[in-house]
């Protein structure tokens, strides 16, 4: 089993589509649908969608823990401007929720792929405190580094830079910059 947090979102849904085509893994998507949507669901018997917050991952996936190969943690609050407007939601998702994902992986020896952000490494790392979003994401990277030192926790980090493509959000408060441009152009 591969678990994808944020599986109903832009990046997560495209990853699910790829994994369904290229692997034989069963897939569990965890999403709170704050920016993800059911229209992004990949209809396939190998995919199961669960509506929940990442902070509840342990109690929800406990029965699957010995069957999970890896977790792709893409389900975090992910907009800079909105992190000022909804700082509590940003912290709940990116700090509390991510901590639960990290602990679940660590406790059950599950491989983790973490989605970092260019917002926390801009200006040679000096921009990591420019927004609640960048701050929480940079602190998560520090936590992962410490988990590696303390417990030999193994993980991989991927960085996304203005991603675009199928299922991107083109309108509303969670729209991506490229999605807004596309929406105005079309």
Where on the chain are the PLM-derived regions?
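N-terminal Rossmann-like NAD(P)+-binding domain of SDR-like oxidoreductases, especially those catalyzing
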Residues: 1-163
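Glycine/proline-rich active-site loop of Rossmann-fold NAD(P)-dependent oxidoreductases
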Residues: 138, 151, 163-179, 186
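Conserved catalytic core of Hanks-type protein kinase domains
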Residues: 74, 184-185
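Hydrophobic residues in alpha-helical segments
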Residues: 84, 185-186
């Amino acid at each position: 089993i591969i678990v994808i947090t944020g599986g109903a979102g832009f990046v997560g849904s495209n990853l699910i589509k790829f994994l369904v085509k290229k692997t034989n893994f069963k897939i569990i998507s965890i999403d709170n649908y704050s920016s993800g949507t059911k229209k992004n669901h990949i209809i396939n018997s190998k995919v199961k969608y669960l509506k929940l917050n990442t902070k509840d991952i342990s109690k929800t996936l406990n029965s699957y823990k010995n069957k999970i190969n890896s977790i792709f943690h893409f389900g975090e609050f992910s907009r800079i401007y909105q992190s000022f407007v909804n700082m509590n939601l940003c912290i709940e998702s990116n700090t509390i929720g991510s901590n639960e994902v990290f602990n679940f992986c660590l406790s059950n020896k599950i491989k983790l792929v973490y989605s970092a952000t260019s917002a926390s490494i801009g200006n040679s790392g000096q921009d990591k405190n420019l927004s609640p979003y960048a701050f929480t994401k940079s602190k998560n990277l520090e936590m992962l580094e410490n988990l590696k030192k303390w417990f030999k926790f193994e993980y991989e980090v991927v960085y996304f830079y203005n991603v675009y493509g199928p299922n991107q959000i083109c309108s509303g408060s969670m729209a991506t910059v490229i999605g807004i441009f596309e929406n105005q152009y079309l």
